[in-house]
Amino acid sequence: HQLTPEVENTFWVNLIGRGYPAPRHKFRWCTERLKIKPSNAFILNVVRANGEAILVLGTRKAESSVRRHRMEKLEGDRVRDRLSPNGSLPNSLVYSPIEDWSNDDVWLYLMQSSNPWGYNNKDLLAMYAGASEDNECPLVVDTSTPSCGDSRFGCWTCTLVDKDKSMSAMIQNDEEKEWMLPLLELRNDLDITDDRHLRDFRRMSGKVQLFHDRPIHGPYTEDARHDWLQRLLEAQTWIRSNG
């Protein structure tokens, strides 16, 4: 199953249509709408049809200290080895078979096993290598040396990180990836620190919200949203011709 958000919850409908400012850690409106709601709706449908659901996830403690802490916190509620209750959805469990694997464990398995849907895993390795700054993907025993598993792929519009290092490296290391340059430029322009000159004081309802008797900036202005739409369409046209 390929899950997608409802049209009213898609990224550009909210940013251009409703004028939501680019996501920030204090206003992270994207994750709930784009990822969590579609997933939860699908899981609830499975539970209704079958009485329960088990999610098989590739989450690993080695991904980050935050991920390790969250996973270890849930271990006390396990019903059996690697099988934990889903805290947000009743009658659903989370199975994490590779939770203790390192990055190198993952790559060693992929290089030694065939892909069930027919793609060559070496192409995947090459893609991760291209997303690293030195264009390499070493399998290492020295934990101070980063492996290619540290390359991260998320939404190309993501403004929750300072820089999209993976996309930048892919463009730099591979001429065939230069078609992504308009996307990177658009993403970087969305990620401006001070966007107050692009935003209106009025909410969609027409109301003005105050904080200590001073108006708070609200959605993007109509002119700003028109500019984002024009630039997005220009990037789309260029990519269709050159990508």
Go through each PLM region and give its residues.
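Nucleotide-activated chemistry modules centered on ATP-dependent adenylation/adenylyltransferase
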Residues: 1-243
